A protein has these predicted regions:
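Short loop/hinge segments at the start of secondary-structure elements
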Residues: 93, 108, 114-118, 122-129
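Juxtamembrane helix-capping/reentrant segments at transmembrane boundaries
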Residues: 36-50, 105-118
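Membrane-interface loops
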Residues: 23-40
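Membrane interface segments of multi-pass transport proteins and intramembrane proteases
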Residues: 101-111, 148-157, 310-312
Length: 365
């Protein structure tokens, strides 16, 4: 418990007090936000605002995890390192994307295929390590089963060592790509992705701590125990990321003095996916990350409807004034802060529903 609290406190203090230094540095090197001309007019004032703030978020979380574990004289588990690897790895993909945007002053950084490739490399490496890094008893951080609140009977590795491994890797890649892109899409208004990510990842601090107290590895006689490796360390990492986000939000709230950029959104989405995979709650991501599902769904609906109507009538039509959904409400005249707070409320309800499902499953299992 001390490690959970300490990690969150260290990360919060780091981003709260160090982010101004990053703002100054990014202004000096010219890492400012590029704003599309066809976007909402209110966004034009954001041009030049320092971006790549995800560096501060990720660095704060990593330092906090290592600092908390070192202070308490505890080793860092493979599971914790895997989540940090995912966050740093996808953060690096986002950094390259951000760097190209700021250096060339355009809205397109990495091409779509290049970003998919980068996400794929990190996801595949994570999947292989999560399956192969076994302890003395043969337990690995991840399993080959699809999970909801715990592992189901759908074991992908049952298809054989080769086909099964390929299926697991593809499944993990899908989760990582969907989650990281979902957070990335939500990062369109000051503080929206920061606050929403803090709530969603915070759910895994609660889940990890609960799994630790009900762990089969601590006492196999516990009713409805969880076969999750290093669940307490997963809670520590989640707490560190949440602390880092809260400190960053002080500077990212409207009017934002710094943006997280793709460095932050892809890294945070990766951390969220990794926590879900290692806590064996993969499909619980749908309610916990419900806000990200909604905004991503709005983009998919917009594109599909436009292409269908263009194919049928020759003229593409749109469901929303603009996608993602938060921009639709901007164009309808809502204030940005109103949209952000209301979306936070939706995100909070989604997180509460997900955590509620997790607890109810344990209660009635």
């Amino acid at each position: 418990v001390k490690s959970i609290i300490l990690a969150g406190a260290i990360a919060l203090a780091f981003t709260l007090f160090a982010t101004p230094a990053f703002i100054w540095l990014f202004k000096r090197v010219g890492w400012g936000q590029f704003v599309r001309e066809d976007g909402p007019k209110s966004h034009h004032t954001k041009r030049g605002t320092p971006t790549m703030g995800g560096i501060a978020i990720i660095l704060g979380a990593v330092l906090a995890v290592f600092g908390a574990k070192l202070f308490n004289g505890e080793p860092i588990s493979n599971s914790a390192l895997l989540v940090l690897f995912m966050m740093v790895g996808l953060g690096l993909v986002g950094f390259i994307d951000d760097f190209i945007k700021t250096h060339r002053q355009r809205s397109l950084g990495l091409s779509g295929w290049a970003k998919i490739f980068g996400q794929g490399v990190v996801a595949v490496a994570f999947a292989v390590m999560a399956l192969q890094l076994k302890d003395a008893d043969g337990w690995s951080p991840a399993s080959g089963s699809i999970s909801v609140v715990r592992d189901t009977n759908i074991d992908l590795l049952a298809w054989g060592p080769v086909v099964g491994l390929i299926l697991v890797v593809l499944w993990i890649y899908f989760l990582v790509a969907a989650t990281s892109n979902g957070v990335n899409i939500a990062d369109g208004l000051d503080g929206l992705a920061t606050g929403s990510s803090a709530m969603a990842i915070g759910a895994y601090a609660v889940i990890g701590f609960w799994q630790f107290n009900q762990s089969c590895f601590r006492d196999p006689l516990i009713q409805n125990c969880y076969e999750v490796k290093d669940s307490l360390d997963l809670a520590v990492v989640a707490s560190a990321v949440v602390g880092s986000l809260i400190g960053f939000l002080w500077w990212n709230t409207s009017p934002a003095q710094i943006f997280m950029g793709d460095t932050g959104s892809l890294g945070l989405g990766g951390a969220l996916a990794a926590l879900a995979i290692l806590t064996r709650t993969e499909l619980l991501l749908i309610p916990i990350g419900g806000l990200f599902v909604i905004v991503t769904g709005s983009v998919i609906i917009q594109r599909v409807y436009f292409k269908l109507t263009k194919w049928k009538t020759g003229t593409g039509k749109r469901v929303f004034l603009m996608s993602p959904l938060h921009h639709h409400f901007e164009l309808k005249g809502w204030e940005q802060i109103t949209i952000v707070v209301r979306f936070w409320l939706i995100g909070a309800l989604c997180v509460l529903s997900g955590v509620g499902m997790f607890y109810l499953e344990w209660t009635y299992a």
